[in-house]
Amino acid sequence: MNYKKTKIVIAIIVFLVLGLAAFAGLLYYQNAENKAAEIAQQKALEQQAKEAAMAAEKERQAAEKQAYELADHVYSHRGASSDEIEHTFAAYDKAIAQGSHNIEQDLVISADGTLYISHDLTSDRIAGSGGAFSSMTDSQIDALTTSDGQKILKLSDVFDKYGKSVKYIIELKSSDSRTVDAFRDVVDKYDMKDQIVVQCLELQALKDLEEYYPDMPKLYIVKDQSSFDYGLTKEYVDIIGVRKNLMSSSNCDKAHDCGKDFNAWTLDTDDEIISAIKMGADSYFTNHTDRAIELEKEYRNNEE
């Protein structure tokens, strides 16, 4: 009898052990399944996060590319000259910080044949003294400073500082061979021919430069309608730059019909800039780079 009871007890114990083992196994597999599900879910979340990050980066790059392309329509007139003294590193730095990659230089030549950057033919307005650049030696010009202590820049100074990180919209204030030759020397020395839009009020300078730099865009600056119409007939003129009183849809269309880009100067009010954008102007000069780029984003290619 005791033997029978012992067998029963042993059987019960075995049953319980097996049951517990089965239960433990079930728990193990459930935990394993749960763990696998958690890992799969975590991987899915990580993949979603990765895809979202990639989409955000792609969107950021697209926005950055669009902003860059829109800024290409904006020529920073003498740098950010509404905020800093014109044609100084401070003015150029500010324009670039505002999103510009097209900064303007006006070139004058010294008695020593060096190209300096100044809108005026004399240094009086910017430096308060000096006289005509063409009558001053390099050492005399180098001794001059602006009202806030900045030096009068050479074209080579600007190339040294910015290199090929920006485009240079360079106006020759004279079409004489001395200025044109000096310009070529500096451009060739720094290998900048692909970084420049050259502009002049006189066609002869542009014609002379066409021989040396056929692929360099040439901008003819015009102040009256007859000059505008005449400029359209010149094959070496790539861009017609009009004073803003000549900025109109009809002139813009004429330029495009002749295979020329249409440019206007100098636009500073919102209405002027918006008008240029809406009529399809390819570029324009402004003293307010940051505002112009904002308006480009809002109105360029906006069909409403």
What are these model-derived regions, one by one?
Residues 2-304:
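Phosphate-group recognition and catalysis centered on beta-loop-alpha active-site segments
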